[in-house]
């Protein structure tokens, strides 16, 4: 059985991810109490259900403390388990709740929205590092759906998943990054009016950047660094490694280098690529 477990902060996109998985053929269960997880999986195995996605949130209360043990038990039973933890900056969550006008699930009478968000963050903190952390701050629903689709369509198998992520420093450093490389010192196509409308996946930008020695040297240096230390991360039993590449706006230099790195490592690991602040995503 393939099991994708989703948890994280309310308002960070769990429902968006779960809906995409349901559309992709997964048997989905939302807001499942932790104590019921192994019971549900046992029942679905008897029914020969092979693809399952379950969302668990803070409404499980202190039952959240039981989750690490439940996950270990499921892994020992031979289930192919993936755990995704979604989160966002507090200001992003406040904005989303303001726009949706929905009530926070942990909000109590006399408690502010900020207090409810912080209480939920504290409650879920012990499980936030059990799997792959995804910072959805600034991500639109369609971008999150595309990321989940790319994730589940990636070549299955054991081993580490290597994510190359581009971003713009003016929007902030992604909190889910394990390694961050700053490429703002490289020549910037933004200052060429003819190149500005393109992005780092377009041939005019690729040709411009690959014609600059500094770009090629930094690109190759980053690849060597990742290649040198990747075995160490694998030995540490890491399931995921997110390498973030940042330029000023996240449109040209970082996008090009993230795409190039994804191509370089495609035959050495399970590779994903994401462009956090690319226009139109």
From Swiss-Prot:
Q: Which UniProt keywords apply?
A: ATP-binding, GTP-binding, Nucleotide-binding
Q: Where is the signal peptide?
A: none
What InterPro entries does this protein map onto?
Answer: P-loop_NTPase, RapZ-like, RapZ-like_N, RapZ_C
For ATP, which residues are the binding ones? 8-15
Q: Which NCBIfam families match?
A: PRK05416.1 (NF003828)
Q: Which GO terms describe its molecular function?
A: ATP binding; GTP binding
The UniProt entry, under HAMAP family, shows: RapZ_like (MF_00636)
Q: Name one Pfam family in it.
A: PapZ_C
Which residues are recorded as binding GTP? Answer: 57-60
Q: Out of the domains of life, which is the source?
A: Bacteria
Q: State the protein's name.
A: Nucleotide-binding protein Daro_0070
What function is annotated for this protein? Answer: Displays ATPase and GTPase activities.
Family assignment?
A: Belongs to the RapZ-like family.
